[in-house]
Amino acid sequence: MSFGRDMELEHFDERDKAQRYSRGSRVNGLPSPTHSAHCSFYRTRTLQTLSSEKKAKKVRFYRNGDRYFKGIVYAISPDRFRSFEALLADLTRTLSDNVNLPQGVRTIYTIDGLKKISSLDQLVEGESYVCGSIEPFKKLEYTKNVNPNWSVNVKTTSASRAVSSLATAKGGPSEVRENKDFIRPKLVTIIRSGVKPRKAVRILLNKKTAHSFEQVLTDITDAIKLDSGVVKRLYTLDGKQVMCLQDFFGDDDIFIACGPEKFRYQDDFLLDESECRVVKSTSYTKIASASRRGTTKSPGPSRRSKSPASTSSVNGTPGSQLSTPRSGKSPSPSPTSPGSLRKQRISQHGGSSTSLSSTKVCSSMDENDGPGEGDELGRRHSLQRGWRREESEEGFQIPATITERYKVGRTIGDGNFAVVKECIERSTAREYALKIIKKSKCRGKEHMIQNEVSILRRVKHPNIVLLIEEMDVPTELYLVMELVKGGDLFDAITSTSKYTERDASGMLYNLASAIKYLHSLNIVHRDIKPENLLVYEHQDGSKSLKLGDFGLATIVDGPLYTVCGTPTYVAPEIIAETGYGLKVDIWAAGVITYILLCGFPPFRGSGDDQEVLFDQILMGQVDFPSPYWDNVSDSAKELINMMLLVNVDQRFSAVQVLEHPWVNDDGLPENEHQLSVAGKIKKHFNTGPKPSSTAAGVSVIATTALDKERQVFRRRRNQDVRSRYKAQPAPPELNSESEDYSPSSSETVRSPNSPF
């Protein structure tokens, strides 16, 4: 008993023990329960226990083998995660994509990989862990990729300690200042969402006006005055949400302010002609001079004003009037300014401080307006950084190894992360497309681009858009791509005068040949749809399809769990999240075949409610309604049914599709009845007129893996999803292979009796 009391009193001061023993004692020598040390400790221990139970443990998680991922901080508490499995599920939603952890998070390792975590109790406050799937632990210096500023509250006991521990107390002002090294004087344009023409204001951000993300949001609310009240969200013109203060100081300088209301990309993020003119008038010379005013020591109330005050003083006009006077001065930051200190870092990002988004939305006006002060400013920037302006208007130098072999022409496509230029091989006069990916736009996600390019390197097939050549430099990645000029699949159908089952059969023959080749390499495309099927016109007048856009493609070495793709063409096993493989491409091809023969998809939702569509896909009930299918052969319907089987094992493989009579011409009807599907395709799909026949091919090339992040969607699982998914009957007479490992065909794959 005495030993227990000594243990209990360890946390008390030794000099108070004697007083506590003698004070309030009774005749029997026992201390009074009211004043005893035991009673005091009992109350303290209870409060500490309750506090520790409620307190969240802050830990950092990395992705196994991902040397570019800086980790994500999680607050682990019993209220948030009731079980270890719940934590794994949440980590899967956060960390899994089509490249990293495609099978989901199934294992958590300690940072050294020596131990596997199996319960929440094993997670230690402030430590770091590595999330993996079924692959072995990959030993990397994960903590070397982490910015030490990932927590303001870190207190290290020694400089050599690899992993910092987190403290619960808030850091002091000095720590906060250290974490604002990214702040530099910058003038941003804020456009309010809503009916056009929209109000816009310019706000100066610097270390005096940008104290925190919440404070900047408050200042923007005061300046922009949304009809719906408080500004809840900010987006770049690319649709990326601004999540923290540092996002204001990236490459973007135009932001859309939104309240709690819903928004549509085509309505809110696309600027009309008047808004382009207004944005273009935002001279970067003005920004530079405003930056100098923000950094120099000058008396007056402007140094103490908040962002809205800075807005009016900097602009000199009301917020809705964005035109500024032209100035011939070019920005030249002082040797001690943040701009000069970061000159080397800016050059690694691609150089000019001009926003890619603002350049993109005003490109059509720039072609007609002639050279202006902004062009002269960009030319000075390019000369300062050693770029050859005459070779590239976007501000990057094309490597000599490419210009020696190819004549690079005008820009024909502009995506979120890539630019596409005309490219003609000098020796053969053959026309290609030069895809230029700016690495500054992909910072932190380079692995996604690398995955796409690595797959393009491996594939070489007459029904696949080819990668001809690549060149990797520190600031850009150059890809010489095959340019397909015949439009996409929908263009071919809607523009033809006569369209029959034989044409549809030839199209499926081309598509199945490409899928067969990919599956023989264990590559799954995951985004097969008409927009990614381009029409190639041969010299003899015949046509064939080429499959492009490998942004979601990946190697299959086990079940995949990432829910991604285009909803109309997504397979049921993807939605059910039970694990999927190569045959999701066959399902998509089956949906396309159905559309080719009637003009509308087999599974249709109601409005924007994707759950209705997903439920139909999970059921897998394929109907052939009259009169749309009255003139279609039974052989075609049979093939579609076999391609759209919910049971993956019974679903056709690519080899079986190619061997089917309807595809190899044996099952085609003798009387070629013309199919009237063009009007239905125009009604059910967005197939508006394109500016040129090459627009579809350029659009496919301009797309990158980073654009596909929007196609990774999440669906709340219903309790009966798996039961419905597994309950579908399968024809017992078929015993097809579960995967397609057939060798690839080396000859040009074209249906012998069809233009395709």
UniProtKB/Swiss-Prot annotation:
UniProt similarity note: Belongs to the protein kinase superfamily. CAMK Ser/Thr protein kinase family. CaMK subfamily.
Annotated InterPro entries: Doublecortin_dom (IPR003533), Doublecortin_dom_sf (IPR036572), Kinase-like_dom_sf (IPR011009), Prot_kinase_dom (IPR000719), Protein_kinase_ATP_BS (IPR017441), Ser/Thr_kinase_AS (IPR008271)
Residues bearing PTM Phosphoserine: 32, 36, 305, 307, 330, 332, 334, 337, 347, 352-353, 355, 364, 392, 742, 751, 754
Reaction(s) catalysed (UniProt annotation): L-seryl-[protein] + ATP = O-phospho-L-seryl-[protein] + ADP + H(+); L-threonyl-[protein] + ATP = O-phospho-L-threonyl-[protein] + ADP + H(+)
Name of encoding gene: Dclk1
Record carries keyword Transmembrane helix: no
Any one GO molecular function term: protein serine kinase activity
Biased composition (Low complexity): 297-313, 347-364
Function: Probable kinase that may be involved in a calcium-signaling pathway controlling neuronal migration in the developing brain. May also participate in functions of the mature nervous system.
PANTHER family per record: SERINE/THREONINE-PROTEIN KINASE (PTHR24347)
SMART domains from the UniProt entry: DCX, S_TKc
GO biological process entries: axon extension; axonogenesis; brain development; central nervous system projection neuron axonogenesis; dendrite morphogenesis; forebrain development; intracellular signal transduction; negative regulation of protein localization to nucleus
UniProt-recorded name of the protein: Serine/threonine-protein kinase DCLK1
SUPFAM superfamilies reported for this sequence: Doublecortin (DC) (SSF89837), Protein kinase-like (PK-like) (SSF56112)
PTM sites of type Phosphothreonine: 46
Residue ranges, compositional bias (Basic and acidic residues): 711-723
Active site: 527 (proton acceptor)
Protein's UniProt keywords contain Phosphoprotein: yes
Stretches assigned to the Protein kinase domain: 406-663
The protein's Enzyme Commission number: 2.7.11.1
